Curated annotation (Swiss-Prot):
GO terms for cellular component: cytoplasm. The keyword ATP-binding applies. Pfam families: NAD_kinase, NAD_kinase_C. Its EC number is 2.7.1.23. Residues 132-151 are annotated as: Disordered. NAD(+) binds at D67, G68, N160, D161, R190, D192. NCBIfam families: PRK02645.1. Its cofactor is a divalent metal cation. The lineage of its organism: Bacteria, Bacillati, Cyanobacteriota, Cyanophyceae, Synechococcales. It comes from the Bacteria. This is NAD kinase 1. InterPro entries: ATP-NAD_kinase_N (IPR017438), ATP-NAD_kinase_PpnK-typ_C (IPR017437), NAD/diacylglycerol_kinase_sf (IPR016064), NADK (IPR002504). It is found in: Cytoplasm. The active site is at D67 (proton acceptor).
Amino acid sequence: MRLDRVWVIYRADSQPAQREARQCAKELKALGSEVTTAMSGARVNPFPGLLATQEQLPDLAVVLGGDGTVLGAARHLAVHDIPILSINVGGHLGFLTHDRRVLRGDEIWQRLLNDQYAMERRMMLQAMVDRRSAEERADAPTPLQQPDVEDDDEHHWALNDFYLRAYRDEISPTCTLELEIDGEVVDQIRGDGLILSTPTGSTGYALAAGGPILHPGIDAIVVAPICPMSLSSRTVVVPPRARLVIWPLGAGDHRIKLWKDGVGCTVLEPGECCVVQQARHHAQMVQLNQSPSYYRTVASKLHWAGSLTAAQPSHN
């Protein structure tokens, strides 16, 4: 891997992440890299500015923070095929990150320069909000196109998940969502909402809603109702090429809010719909571990060990 140009992105509210960012920049500059540092957080989004002002894209983006910082980076960098090296500094679970100890010494940069790493491709989703009237859809029923940039209120990307929930401040309401898969209405879900998750996001909100754990090597979409009020509304896993359309049902005040990776996107009115499908691009995640184990990660992060807590595993 070339390290001519590197972006170092650090979590905005973390002093340890800021200190590590300064150290990474110092080490990379000593190797001759052109380094740009920027902070990222819930109220700070550096990527539109970086992508608009930098003459050339970086060879690598080093992301220092937790999973939320990584998710924000992936949503903007994946479409440009920029590799992401994520390191947990100031984060919590850190499903998508390396341990902070990999930063000790400058061996990490030499490994990258010597191509001693692997690249994981993580599936992403795209949501497109269709605000056209029924008459406009009848005149132009073709599917909405996937743009190359997330540049407006109608197009959004997610590495973990999208979810839709009722949008009311004064009460805690339920909502009714009609789910259409590949042109066929399969359910009208009444409950707290609906999650559409990638395999990467299957260990997050979708898991809490009763969904399955999917290995990230699989491309598929998890469709998980949130607290449905019917036993027949169940989680399903659909192929990655499935086209899912979600329609809010009810009166005009039954608005629905769309969220991406835990960040609010936009609000849908009854009569509008949200189209979710696999994005054309994947997140490119740098993997430094020589023997990575997804199952070991799940066991350690979610304390998923079963009977291993009571007995030693066999050697078979």
